[in-house]
Amino acid sequence: MKPAALLVLVSAAFAQQPQPAPHAGYVYPAGGRQGTTFEVTVGGQALNGVNNVYLSGPGVHVSIIEYERPMTPAEANTLREQAQELNKKRQANPGAFPAADMQKLLEIRDKLAKFVRRPMNAAIAETVRIGVTVDPGAAPGSRELRLATPNGMTNPLAFQIGTLPEWTRATAEAISAPGVARPAQQRNITPSTAATAPIDVTLPVVINGQIMPGAIDRYRFAAAKGQRLVAIANARELIPYISDAVPGWFQAALALRDSAGKEVDYADHYSFHPDPVLYYEIPADGQYTIEIHDSIYRGREDFVYRIQLGELPFVTGIFPLGGKAGARTAVEVKGWNLPSPRLAETGKAKGVELVSPANSNAVPFAVDTLPEALEKEPNDRTQNAQKLKLPVIVNGRINRPGDQDVFRFDAKAGDEIVAEVMARRLDSPLDSILRLTDGKGKELAVNDDTEDKSAALLTHHADSRIMLKLPAKGTYYLFLADAQHKGGPDYAYRLRVSHPQPDFELRVTPSGINARSGATIPVAVHAIRRDGFDGEIAVKLKDAPAGF
């Protein structure tokens, strides 16, 4: 990626003094079921005057119930003095204490309780309560929620619409102990020794909760022998980045216990994704308990989670990982509780689409315009290398640990070639390594990892890429393997071998701007240049509002 260009947006009218930008740190619960009405709380900063809620997609209706800012110490002292006076009055004449005074005393106690339980992080100290109604036909999936204030809109938060019954734990503000400081990072935190009893839930269910320091949230349910239980935790999926939490997000861990309290399964991740997924075939009828906690027992209001729990469909892998645009591709599907091991997918346009067989989790499916081919075994040596006609995208697998796939192609002197693997970016566990040699075995290029700045949430950019001008006419060999010598049916890949296809993508930061009248607003436009594209890029506002 070349340095970002600075685009300056100027809105008409007079300049005003800049105000703090509104910020949303979390929404809880972070979703709800079709056909239900419920309340959510948004925690953030500079939310005073909030006047609207924007939720992407149709079928969901929202309204603001209440804005609440954190109380100052001086205001708390005033309330304490008022409470003392009311208590004196009550003690002096208990039998004749007016009902209105009792109500006022209870309200003061509630406000003081909120004061001592307030978040220690100013970035989530203000709250907005919102009413949400989801139409029965609202499309399930993830949406974006933002708040609008006189000073602009907040950053977006993930908000999920589901089809399963939901159970929501009381907000952390209502259940945490008075006087407890709650930074996201705390030293020497250990699990709570006074854990509450498990909460009973009925499968299938989506469980909403917030993890506090040292807490382990427990949920008990009845399960029958032979049930194929799936527990899917969403944590980083909801809030990808928490600035003062290491490694930068809520790292959830799941544990499953039987009726005797024995741990029978555990997960603190799924494949290379930080959010854990647990699969367990129930061996006997009984009561089971699912537990969730932070991996190092941190916690705070913005450690929000959703657990999908039940005999649910879950896709663990597909093959091939993509297909040609406009063509019908037969896809093998692997996973749990799936009605069919196959589906047919027709890619619409070049890019990456999401497919969700049988209302399961969504998995990426790459679509391209180049010819497609399947890897043909055996092809693990130069002697049986699979011949390629360029350009082509090969769909293959590293079938076993230590396996490698070898391909050969013919080229002329001066030909420029690109060999690029797409695997990790398509949810494959493959950590590819790619090697190019000439016909005599001389190594011309090798690559393990290539960073793709368009895949920002990947913690390991494991896909390989080689771009090289070939020195002579002849036959060339590509060797593709797993850098960790792993392999298996899930280790799928797409290997593009072609001449360069120069192109670019743009990303704009920040994700939203707040433009007051007369203000000059800088935004950064990042150019992701593909296959050596080095041309100029003209940037302009599309459908710009009047005055910009």
Segments predicted by a language model, with ranges:
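Sec-dependent N-terminal signal peptides
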Residues: P3-A13
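Acidic, Ser/Thr/Pro-rich low-complexity intrinsically disordered segments
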Residues: Q19-R90, A99, I161, D200-S360, ...
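Ligand-binding face of N-terminal immunoglobulin V-set domains in extracellular IgSF glycoproteins
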Residues: Q34-G44, L55-G57, N77-Q160, L278
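Extended, compositionally biased low-complexity polar/Lys-Gly-rich tracts
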Residues: A122-A139, R143-L147, R187-Q210, A253-L256, ...
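Predominantly extracellular/luminal regions of secreted and cell-surface proteins
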Residues: L157-T202, N359-V392
